[in-house]
Curated annotation (Swiss-Prot):
Native source organism of the sequence: Mus musculus (Mouse)
Positions of region (Tropomyosin-binding): 39-138
Record keywords: Actin-binding, Cytoplasm, Cytoskeleton
Lineage: superkingdom: Eukaryota
Protein name (Swiss-Prot/TrEMBL): Tropomodulin-1
Biological-process GO terms, alphabetical: adult locomotory behavior; lens fiber cell development; muscle contraction; myofibril assembly; pointed-end actin filament capping
Source lineage: Eukaryota, Metazoa, Chordata, Craniata, Vertebrata
Amino acid sequence: MSYRRELEKYRDLDEDEILGALTEEELRTLENELDELDPDNALLPAGLRQKDQTTKAPTGPFKREELLDHLEKQAKEFKDREDLVPYTGEKRGKVWVPKQKPMDPVLESVTLEPELEEALANASDAELCDIAAILGMHTLMSNQQYYQALGSSSIVNKEGLNSVIKPTQYKPVPDEEPNSTDVEETLERIKNNDPELEEVNLNNIRNIPIPTLKAYAEALKENSYVKKFSIVGTRSNDPVAFALAEMLKVNKVLKTLNVESNFISGAGILRLVEALPHNTSLVELKIDNQSQPLGNKVEMEIVNMLEKNTTLLKFGYHFTQQGPRLRASNAMMSNNDLVRKRRLADLTGPIIPKCRSGV
């Protein structure tokens, strides 16, 4: 508090008045002390960091005319440097003469039958346009005029060869309607285990809070009817992915999970994939198009987990490397082959999967 009271005495002082009362010697002393405190002048604006260099005594009177005369005299007395190789003026090679273009032969006058000459003489531009289209002279007209004339037996261009063609009017495509799902009501229906609710679609609802999405994951742990859960484009992040991973370890009904186009990193994706061995009901998982790439290390770990899984049939992710992409494709093909064999044999027990150690 005492330090602040000392500063109060200097609050109303006029710095310009104090600096104006200092002598030149005192100003130099102050400048030297400031140089010691801030040698790089980092606290000053860039335009004020250069010291005053105009205080030196002049070496003599400045006369512009005499300076120009001196520079001109010095330029005349200075000898030009001689060329290392003197210019002889010798011309080598041949002078380029452009070739004469061949002259087009004069077209002979074409004589037509009197009926054709009379018809062409009295034809309008619109009729000539249709005739040119029929004869294949499409360079005289636009594409729209040409195809309209070919597709109609009557005159379709009423304005002639030089008419302005309007572009084709396309029907406006309306924007997709926003997602009409009631977030709070759907959450309550999941908590109440509503048997009529089998698909939850929260796609492109960007204002869902993260705690609400985590509440969905918690509610799905005890739900017995929801088979499809999609949160595409909901700005979900790693905490949501962690909650969904814990849900997959408990839920035994969910078949499809879609978390594409979100902000889930590699750690969140790994948690989701690592939860697959504890889940036997999920057959489709989509994780593509996240805000940041997963990386080669994460992709290899994902493939290792997919090769150990025997129930997942569809995996929505585009691998950047060919090796993980091929291994994941083989794993999904093997799982689908197991389903096909079980369906053909009509077995109720588990089928021993083919060994994938050599994949």
